[in-house]
Amino acid sequence: MQPLHGNCLIAYARHKYILTMVNGEYRYFNGGDLVFADASQIQVDKCVENFVLVSRDTLSLFLPMLKEEALKLHAHKKVPSLLVHHCTRDIPVFQEVAQLSQNKNLRYAEMLRKRALIFALLSVFLEDTQFIPLLLNVLQPNMRTRVCTVINNNIAHEWTLARIASELLMSPSLLKKKLREEGTSYSQLLTECRMQRALQLIVIYGVSIKRVAVSCGYHSVSYFIYVFRNYYGMTPTEYQERSAQELPNCGPAASMAAQGNFYGTDRSAEGIRL
């Protein structure tokens, strides 16, 4: 057995079950126990039907779903390495997630379904006060992720550097410095978050350009179109027309929009929240 570094795991005990910690300790679980754990602290054998590995990338996409207050929580000095939630009913989707996780050649729709089901399993732990500290302790989100989470909780707000810094309980100068160290700025992230949201509203929901502009925090439709064209290389209307042609064939526009609907694209994975 080997420890699983990076990532987290979700284990489901249909019957009595034992997990071995890296320090040699044994943890015993009863049937119906759902476990969320720091994978680096667990040793797992080759029998994988009762657990699902959750990658850092997937956790990063789950994080923006949380309210910004969650990111103000400081990890406890002694964060537990695992949490247990006892389920009174069977979890039929767990086996499906486990099977999808073992398949290395998932179709695009299967990949999205797997991600959505993992999010559903993670949500079971949201009422546990230790869940967010453990999640943050494992993920250690960078400043980009924190800023995008704040923005996406109120995408239409007139965000300024000072306002975002206030939400994150730090000075504007410190926030600016930390973002510079990560090679970005608050204005760049604000544009990225708004453009990703605009793409979702236009392609997936067919919202009018005027409503999209307002929903994304732009008072001027013409300025919104200008920013959109600079970001995507075409106007919102042109993007609508192209995506309408490609959606039946699952082309790149559909792919980009669908992935954005599940909290991110390769271009900005950290900050999309519907």
UniProtKB/Swiss-Prot annotation:
- List keywords of the entry alphabetically: Activator, DNA-binding, Repressor, Transcription, Transcription regulation, Virulence
Which residues mediate DNA binding here? 162-183, 209-232
Q: Which InterPro entries match?
A: Homeodomain-like_sf, HTH_AraC, HTH_AraC-typ_CS, Tscrpt_reg_AraC-type_HTH
A single MF term (Gene Ontology): transcription cis-regulatory region binding
Matching entries from Pfam families are given as:
HTH_18
Task: Recount the UniProt induction comment for this entry.
Answer: Expression can be activated by RpoS and repressed by CRP, H-NS and GadW, depending on the conditions.
HTH araC/xylS-type domain boundaries: 145-242
GO cellular component assignments: cytosol
The record's function comment reads:
Positively regulates the expression of about fifteen genes involved in acid resistance such as gadA, gadB and gadC. Depending on the conditions (growth phase and medium), can repress gadW. Negatively regulates perA expression in acidic conditions and positively regulates it in alkaline conditions.
Query: What interactions and quaternary structure are annotated?
Result: Homodimer.
- For this entry, the protein name equals HTH-type transcriptional regulator GadX
Organism annotation: Escherichia coli O127:H6 (strain E2348/69 / EPEC)
Gene assigned in the entry: gadX
